[in-house]
Amino acid sequence: MDIKSNSFFYIFISVVLLLIAILQYDLWFSNTGFIKYQALKKSVISQQKEVKHKSQTNVQLYSEVVSLRQNSEVLESLARENMGLIKQGEVFYSVK
């Protein structure tokens, strides 16, 4: 009976170790595991930085749009610089 209980003990320990190994594999390497979690966490941080940068750009562009709508001098200045706009009767000189 000693051999029988001894073999039962070894089988029990083997099953417990196998279950622990399966759970550890699931913890580290599955789709919901720690390694996947770390990769997703890095991705979220990167995307949050990108969103913050784009929000700042949007604020700058919005302020530019507001200034263009409210001040015709700003609009005229921008048209002169970027599109070469000149008024009737003006002469444009390009100095290089």
From Swiss-Prot:
Please list the residue ranges that the record places on the Periplasmic side of the membrane. Answer: 30-96
Membrane-topology annotation of the record: Single-pass type II membrane protein
Subunit structure of this chain's protein: Part of a complex composed of FtsB, FtsL and FtsQ.
Q: So what does this one do?
A: Essential cell division protein. May link together the upstream cell division proteins, which are predominantly cytoplasmic, with the downstream cell division proteins, which are predominantly periplasmic.
Q: Per the UniProt record, which residue ranges are transmembrane?
A: 12-29
The text of the family note is: Belongs to the FtsB family.
Keywords attached to this Swiss-Prot or TrEMBL record, sorted alphabetically, are:
Cell cycle, Cell division, Cell inner membrane, Cell membrane, Membrane, Transmembrane, Transmembrane helix
Per the UniProt record, the source organism is: Francisella tularensis subsp. tularensis (strain SCHU S4 / Schu 4)
* Protein name per its UniProtKB record: Cell division protein FtsB
**Encoding gene per record:** ftsB
List the stretches on the Cytoplasmic face of the membrane: 1-11
Quick check: keyword Methyltransferase in the entry? Answer: no
Its GO CC terms? cell division site; cell septum; plasma membrane
Task: State where the protein is found.
Answer: Cell inner membrane
Principal place where this protein is found? membrane
> What is a biological process (GO) this protein takes part in?
FtsZ-dependent cytokinesis
The record's annotation in HAMAP family points to: FtsB
